[in-house]
Amino acid sequence: MTKQVFWDDIDVGHKIPGYSLKIDPTRIALQVSGSQDFYPVHHDLDFAKAGGHPDIFVNTGFMQGCFNRLICGWIGDDGWLKKFRMEMRRMNFPGDTMTFQGKVSKKFIEDGEHLVECELWAENEREGVTTPSFALVSLPARSE
């Protein structure tokens, strides 16, 4: 169980605890089969190479799931993910170690709701930041 984060206890610049994953073909194949994304570029090396890619690569659902783990693991059971956006700008291939991180970029109250904007990103050792992302979350306040 994740310790609950409260709006009152964070400030702009607060770091969201990150995590890393080593990517391998099995991890990619399991994710794409589980999400029924059977496009061969995610599991067939020859097909991926014929398309100009050096290897198979992770798909959109994989990235969304990893960011969901990052942000929802941080906000706790009483937090609420209101908006999420990501931009897949670079590829993540087998052999890459992906690191998911974030920080608080803004906090405010709107219509009585305690809101936090978060800058999130995924990076690997080859490309640096591969997927910049954004989340708007609602957090409980200690004063309530």
What are these regions (language model features)?
Residues 1-15, 92-144:
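HotDog/MaoC-like acyl-thioester-processing domains
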Residues 20, 85, 132-136:
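Well-ordered beta-strand positions in beta-sheet-rich domains
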Residues 23, 88, 137-139:
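Hydrophobic residues in beta-strands and at strand termini
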Residues 73-96:
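Mid-chain, well-packed structural core segment of small domains
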